[in-house]
Amino acid sequence: RLDAVAFLWKESNTTCLNLPQTHEIVRLLRTLIEHYDPSVLIITETNIPNRENLSYFGNGNEAHIIYNFALPPLILQAMVTGNNYYLNNWLMSMPPAQDGTTYLNFIASHDGIGLRPVEGILSQQEIQELIETMRDFGGLISSRNLNGGSEKPYEINISLFSALQGTVAGPDELQVERFLCAH
């Protein structure tokens, strides 16, 4: 598992995020690992916008498995709004995994619910509505620094069970049912 691999290569005057050299290193690691033991799989953890995340498959010569980071916030957004438009649209637009690769679908982790993966999928209004709903349910929001000193929401810190205690209209009696449905 290559954790936060998108930040691997550091170069002055860049964001140090998702640079071409990082992809070269992942390809090199895959070549070395396949030579040593072809049964070993590389999984990349890249909590970045979905399009950039997909780039870690390369041409079938980088990661064998990538975390599907857009799935948790999209399921959450669909469950609390009652609208599956964005989730369905994303699912229908996802390319099939190439031969020898696959997606790791998950709906919760020890980290927060990332918002970067849904940049370009959810509108800013939808993201803000999700943030406000999660704050109402006790969630905290982590932010990242942007150029110029401003901040942008990065992650919602709340358990999935707590996040599903209601809808945008507020808490209700369907938390357990909603939690089971998410699975």
Where are these regions (language model features)?
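Active-site and adjacent substrate-binding regions of carbohydrate-active enzymes
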Residues: 1-183
